[in-house]
């Protein structure tokens, strides 16, 4: 009797696993949204001159970012930042010489969507590729 009960539980668990497969896209979404701890500063003015990715010089109001040289995010990639419910999506147009790891420089326009420019820098910001 005990063996039959254990076998029934095993069969039930296997059936539940097969009934609710997780797509690779869903797994990728969870992984993509799992990035935490970004350090964000803002840049603008002449620092926007001659962006690494080329193209038109961005303005302070454009929603753009500079990434560390070792970042997996490259030219044209879009990164979404979420800071205490305030959100912005930026396009990578530049590299940041003083940034490393998960430190990003974003334009004044992008930063101001997350916090006041007077704050200067943000820590523990969630981010993911979009």
Set out the residue ranges of the language-model regions.
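Secreted/periplasmic proteins
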Residues: 2-11, 15-130
């Amino acid at each position: 009797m005990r063996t039959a009960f254990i076998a029934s539980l095993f069969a039930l668990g296997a059936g539940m696993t097969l009934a609710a497969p997780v797509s690779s896209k869903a797994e990728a979404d969870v992984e993509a949204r799992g990035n935490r701890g970004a350090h964000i500063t803002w840049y603008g003015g002449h620092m926007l001159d001659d962006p690494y990715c080329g193209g038109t010089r961005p303005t302070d109001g454009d929603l753009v970012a500079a990434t560390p040289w070792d970042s997996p995010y490259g030219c044209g990639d879009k990164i979404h930042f979420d800071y205490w419910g305030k959100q912005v999506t930026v396009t990578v147009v530049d590299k940041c010489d003083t940034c490393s790891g998960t430190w990003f420089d974003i334009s004044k326009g992008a930063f101001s969507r997350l916090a006041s420019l007077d704050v200067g820098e943000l820590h523990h910001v969630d981010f993911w590729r979009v």
